[in-house]
């Protein structure tokens, strides 16, 4: 597997570790349906978050969060609604984006993480 192909799973694992440190319990990772995919579904006492993880080597071209366009948001919403129809929850649903900047070779160091709630 190419190093580039390993970055996505590495970024999602880094985002999950970040959420755990913030007190979230990971409910699902890479939740896939015919409607789309949600990278991480996590919960704390108040919220059930549907989290899109965006990993980039730098923000030179654009901020990672800018790649969550309206089409992607629609797919996330539809997938989250399907999840909620199959998993009853009293928690308030919320959509978050976790932006990770990881220059080449960063897998051995701490990435820069920004969490947009």
Regions picked out by a protein language model, each given a short descriptive name:
Residues 34-36:
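Short acidic/glycine-enriched loop/turn segments that link adjacent beta-strands
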Residues 38-61, 76:
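Conserved catalytic cores of phosphodiester-cleaving nucleases, focusing on short active-site segments
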Residues 57-81, 85:
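Mg2+/Mn2+-dependent nuclease catalytic core
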Residues 1-30:
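Acidic-basic catalytic patches of nuclease active cores, encompassing PD-(D/E)XK
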Residues 86-117:
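Domain-level recognition of nuclease-like catalytic cores that cleave nucleotide substrates
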């Amino acid at each position: 597997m190419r190093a580039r192909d390993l970055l996505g799973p590495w970024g999602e694992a880094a985002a999950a570790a970040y959420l755990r440190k913030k007190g979230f319990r990971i409910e699902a990772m890479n939740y896939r349906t015919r409607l789309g995919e949600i990278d991480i579904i996590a919960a704390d006492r108040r919220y059930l978050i549907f989290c899109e993880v965006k990993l980039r080597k730098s923000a030179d071209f654009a901020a990672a969060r800018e790649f969550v366009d309206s089409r992607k948001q629609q797919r996330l919403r539809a997938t989250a609604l399907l999840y909620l129809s199959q998993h009853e929850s009293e928690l308030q649903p919320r959509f978050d984006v976790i932006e990770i900047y990881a220059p080449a070779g960063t897998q051995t160091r701490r990435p820069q993480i920004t969490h947009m709630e």
